[in-house]
A protein has these predicted regions:
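Catalytic cores of alpha/beta
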Residues: 27-37, 153-163, 205, 209-225
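Active-site beta->alpha loop and helix N-cap motifs at the rims of alpha/beta catalytic domains
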Residues: 45, 49-51, 60-125, 245
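Glycine/Thr-rich beta-alpha phosphate-binding loop at enzyme active sites
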Residues: 61, 71, 158-194
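N-terminal amphipathic alpha-helix/helix-capping segment at the start of soluble metabolic enzymes
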Residues: 1-20, 86
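Catalytic beta/alpha-barrel core
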Residues: 70-72, 118-131, 145-153, 159, ...
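Glycine-rich phosphate-binding active-site loops on the catalytic face of alpha/beta enzymes
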Residues: 44-54, 119-123, 127-131, 171-180, ...
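C-terminal helical cap(s) of enzyme catalytic domains, especially alpha/beta-barrels
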Residues: 57-67, 229-253
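Hydrophobic faces of well-ordered beta-strands that scaffold small-molecule active sites
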Residues: 16-20, 45-47, 93-97, 122-124, ...
Length: 253
């Protein structure tokens, strides 16, 4: 496993994974937030590279991505930003990036820049398993975790997807589980059990986890919880101090 990411999961009983959009609401905010990351209860930070057609994102994150893109944030500016602050950040940073961006940049060039900017893992939500082998191998050679996404499907397919993975598995939990319906919770528990049956990698649950109540409820079933939309909403305040304080409330035990 990726050393830095695996260390986090080895050191902590439960891991908090957060998400921001690079350059939203501004480049200055993103830089300042990253410099204050150690003051938050986030253990691993996903950073979204703005993209014009973010298929896996909801309205709020898509809008944030659009605003950042319109402001001139590109893959290069994201790399430049991260390179400028990487020596002051102690927590693992993970890219959430759409494959078209990686392909357009050039896979080898993209990975080289990831190494230089301190990226420890990559999530590519629109990359089919059948096409993931090449990039997962190249990432592994550069000590960058390829973090696979798995959703409810056959155990055999989950096993194949997980076999390419490193760092942790991103389990898509948008099963209506943030409510109180017992049937949905049972589906979630069965799904997580299936994932754990076929892989020794830690499992983190994302999609639909928005409140502290959600975080507390889902923590008991997985190794990590991922919060995206709520954190992006907080960053829209353009106030780093407020964002840090509210994130800590969000992940409060």
């Amino acid at each position: 496993m990726n050393r830095n990411i695996s260390n986090i999961f080895n050191e902590k009983k439960k891991v908090n994974v957060g998400y921001i959009v690079a350059g939203y609401p501004s480049t200055d905010f993103t830089r300042e937030f990253l410099l204050n990351l150690d003051r938050t209860s986030i253990d691993i930070l996903e950073i979204g590279i703005p993209y014009s057609d973010p298929l896996a994102d909801g309205k709020l994150i898509s809008n944030a991505s659009f605003i950042a893109s319109e402001a001139g944030i590109t893959t290069d500016t994201v790399f430049e930003l991260l390179t400028s602050v990487k020596d002051k950040i102690t927590k693992p940073l993970v890219f959430l990036v759409y494959y078209n961006l990686v392909f357009a940049y050039g896979i080898d060039n993209f990975i080289e820049k990831c190494v230089k900017s301190g990226i420890k893992g990559i999530i590519i939500p629109d990359l089919p398993f059948e096409e993931a082998h090449e990039i997962s191998e190249k990432l592994k050679k550069n000590n960058i975790a390829f973090i696979p996404l798995v959703s409810v499907t056959s155990e055999e397919r989950i096993s194949k997807i997980a076999s390419l993975g490193d760092g942790f598995i991103y389990a898509i939990g948008s099963l209506g589980v943030t409510g109180t319906k017992q049937v949905d919770l049972e589906r979630l528990k069965n799904f997580i059990s299936e994932v754990k049956n076929v892989s020794e990698l830690p499992v983190s649950l994302g999609f639909g986890i928005r409140t502290n109540e959600d975080v507390k409820k889902m923590r008991q079933y997985v190794d990590g919880v991922i919060v995206g939309t709520s954190i992006v909403a907080l960053t829209s305040s353009e106030n780093v101090e407020f964002t840090v304080n509210e994130i800590n409330k969000l992940f409060e035990v």
